Amino acid sequence: MNNKSLIFLAIKSLDIQNQTCGTINTVSLNFDDQLNQLIIDSRIQSDKDLKIIISKVLNSASQSSLHDSNLANNYNRRFLYYFKKMSFFQYIEKSVYENSILIENLGIVGLYLLYLLIECNGLFRIWVYYKIYNFEHLIKLVETKNNL
């Protein structure tokens, strides 16, 4: 799995989640099918693949400034591109949509949240995560990590 696959997976899964939120009664089958196909298309062989690439990007971002780090800089550049291309993000506030620094920071924060889920649960099961976890659970993980 490469950097582009991770970014596409993270953003597209948000798009799938957004599309299915309005139809809660029909979410499970449609959502599972779409997400399973997305995992296959992204060539994710195992949860370990996801953990390795997330750790590499986060380490790269934390060890030096983003402009000096090719891996983190490449991740942010691609995240910005795909973030702006995804359908439901076209409707966000213009001041947010045009703020590249804010969107780049969102990309790093998103990776950190995924990393916390992996660390908390051992193996990260992406299809289970998107069915049972919510924003409040992510916030609790961050608060728990910060209090250690």
Curated annotation (Swiss-Prot):
Chloroplast keyword on record: yes
Keyword terms of this UniProt record: Chloroplast, Plastid
GO cellular component, one term: chloroplast
UniProt key word Plastid: yes
Protein's cellular compartments: Plastid, Chloroplast
Protein name, entry field: Uncharacterized protein ORF148
Species of provenance: Porphyra purpurea
